[in-house]
Design a protein with these regions (language model features):
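Short hydrophobic/aromatic patches on the structural cores and recognition surfaces of FHA
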Residues: 13, 52, 77, 111, ...
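Short boundary/linker motifs that mark transitions into or out of structured domains
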Residues: 1-30, 88-95, 136
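Short amphipathic alpha-helical recognition elements used for nucleic-acid or partner binding
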Residues: 22-56, 77
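Intrinsically disordered, charged and Pro/Gly-enriched terminal/linker segments
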Residues: 22, 38-39, 61-65, 97-167
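Short acidic/histidine-centered micro-motifs embedded in hydrophobic/aromatic stretches
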Residues: 55, 94, 145
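An acidic helix/loop motif centered on a single conserved Asp/Glu
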Residues: 22-31, 61-64, 68-72
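DNA-binding patch around the recognition helix
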Residues: 1-6, 71-106
Length: 167
């Protein structure tokens, strides 16, 4: 595997050469990465600089040191993501957006795509979906208020899908 991001079960990232780069993500960088990804997956608008700072550092009116910390953290995250083909954190119109090419596989985004696709499902479709979710709880070990809506959506949708499959 290469260019791989797993958010179901244990957080796990492989670079373009298939090297495990998970350890490069400090807890704060992992939180930052997931936050930007989640907000980018909702219509591609990303997250405002103000909301990102409030959610990660808990400041509605950030000081210069908090803004500096945010900038340094974004730079560190970008440096890590350079190791994965065509993954970028963009800053446009005061919003951070995570952009991934189709060469990058992310189980969370694959799950969202699967859930959005309303066509009739076959046995192989359900097996593919099960393969995604069988790695474990989405964002395992992560517990932040801003994650609750995203976790709820995945959990509720998964129950709905599995209920239909059983019927």
């Amino acid at each position: 595997l290469r260019n791989y991001i797993r958010l179901f079960g244990e957080f796990y990232v492989l670079d373009r050469d298939g090297n495990d780069i998970t350890s490069l993500f400090t807890p704060k960088l992992k939180q930052l990465f997931i936050l930007i990804m989640l907000h980018s997956s909702r219509g591609g608008f990303g997250i405002s600089s103000k909301d990102l700072t409030r959610m990660i550092w808990g400041n509605d009116n950030p000081s210069k040191s908090t803004k500096s910390l945010r900038s340094v953290s974004i730079l560190k995250l970008r440096k890590i993501l350079e190791r994965i083909d065509t993954v970028e954190v963009l800053f446009n119109a005061n919003r951070y957006i995570l952009q991934l090419s189709e060469d990058v596989y992310c189980d969370y985004l694959a799950c969202l795509d699967w859930l959005k696709d309303k066509r009739v499902r076959t046995q192989p479709d359900f097996e593919y979906f099960y393969d995604i979710i069988s790695k474990g709880e989405v964002f395992k070990g992560e517990s932040f208020d801003w994650m609750d809506d995203f976790k709820s959506y995945i959990c509720n949708s998964t129950v709905d899908v599995l209920s239909r499959f059983i019927d």
